[in-house]
Amino acid sequence: MDKYQKICNEVRKTYPSLELDNIIKDIRKAVGLIGIDTRESDMKYLPPIFGFIRGCVFIEKGNPVIFINATLEPNAKRYVIAELLGYILLYLPADNIDPNHAYYLKLDESKEENIKINETLYYFAAELLAPTEEVYSDFLSYGKLDYNAIDTIAAKYKVPKRIITNSIKKYLDQKSGGENHDV
């Protein structure tokens, strides 16, 4: 079990509404039950300097609010919610939140610290939405390498296919001691 699996297990223990079945059924409701509102926006109010924004976190009356770009596909919206939830739980300064500040997931990729944050948020979101162990178990149930299985599993967890292929690869890498596997 890697650190992201441990983090997500701890998050699920701390916030029972974030159990996998609840996340699959309605991630917005599950996140709302821990006091985090989610809303959609076309993001047109942001200056063009920001480029394309998939989502951001605003603070409203002391509570974080996740805004998702309304132009995204439904599964991409779910992923952005999970990623921003990770940002809130893992990085947002709980005791020093600036109520006049928006927190964006647009980090300067030239800084190593930001690369690590992006990586952490990707793996957190992937693990929260489609736990590695369960994805691999679902994949094994097909009995052979079947790329249609990837589509079916992605539909089950309501995530982009790359999340499923990366989870399977991650599982194989963990079990083989770190050897790289292609899926």
Segment roles from a protein language model:
Residues 1-183:
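Active-site hotspot residues in diverse enzymes, especially metal/ion-binding acidic/histidine motifs
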